Amino acid sequence: MPKASHQDLRRSFRALTSSNSCFHTASVFDPMSAQIAADLGFEVGILGGSVASLQVLAAPDFALITLSEFVEQATRIGRVAQLPVIADADHGYGNALNVMRTVVELERAGISALTIEDTLLPAQFGRKSTDLISTAEGVGKIRAALEARVDPEMSIFARTNAAIIPVQEAISRVQQYQAAGADGITIVGIRDFDHLAQVSEGITVPLMLVTYGNPELHDNARLAEMGVRVCVHGHAAYFAAIKATYDCLREQRQILGSESNMSATELTHTYTQPEDYVEWAKKFMNVNE
């Protein structure tokens, strides 16, 4: 079977987001997972920023991974991927000028779409990690991303977190990002369909929801009816791989019992030690949450 070009895959993604259906992402974190996802019939994959940090650094999701490290992993995936891959590009790795560089590098890596979020990252001295940048700065980042794009088929989605801001502010943000020219809007933190209807008021571009498996949002037909074209449930495949690796190596070492009763979440916590980063943030950055 002939290999699809990067532009072919970008066109495929645009066809998905132009349809009347809602598609669910496969978590892809390396070339093998991308191959498996395509073979199993997934229409779209996503390289999560948190997963890239775990895969490349064995570090928690504290915006520690650099653009170069993220792009290297995206390039490895893009070399073999036969399904469109979305890159969770976090905050674009800096200001609007950094966003332009991010877009250039991820486009060359073969990514079909990317998201740029308005979270204030990395965490700032004396500021909460859940703070958002101003809407004006977020608009500037989206405009910069569009300016930097060479292939018009690559999609650029603006992302915001509706869980930590009032509904009216969320509405204002997504409407302004749409007006800035974003190809789509990614929303985190939607509670239920009523909340989705409020926040997406006036939005005509495709929606991407990051639900983390929220049971209140499991009606796929209703998601599609409300303009959601991509749904991200999380990265279960990656965490299952961590668990399987641990259990396999544990068995090889002939440790009593073929499987441990440690969950993937517990294993991830054990090997990344996020509490260390929280303490360092308190100690060196005056961040107390």
Curated annotation (Swiss-Prot):
Substrate binds at residues 50, 159, 235. Mg(2+) binds at residue 88. It is an enzyme of class 4 (lyase). Its cofactor is Mg(2+). GO terms for molecular function: magnesium ion binding; methylisocitrate lyase activity; oxaloacetate decarboxylase activity. GO terms for biological process: oxaloacetate metabolic process; propionate catabolic process, 2-methylcitrate cycle; pyruvate biosynthetic process. Keywords: Decarboxylase, Lyase, Magnesium, Metal-binding. The keyword Flavoprotein does not apply. Binds 1 Mg(2+) ion per subunit. Gene3D superfamilies: Phosphoenolpyruvate-binding domains. It catalyses: oxaloacetate + H(+) = pyruvate + CO2. PANTHER family: OXALOACETATE DECARBOXYLASE, PHOSPHOENOLPYRUVATE CARBOXYLASE. Belongs to the isocitrate lyase/PEP mutase superfamily. Oxaloacetate decarboxylase family. HAMAP family: OadC (MF_01299). Catalyzes the decarboxylation of oxaloacetate into pyruvate. Seems to play a role in maintaining cellular concentrations of bicarbonate and pyruvate. Homotetramer; dimer of dimers. This is Oxaloacetate decarboxylase.
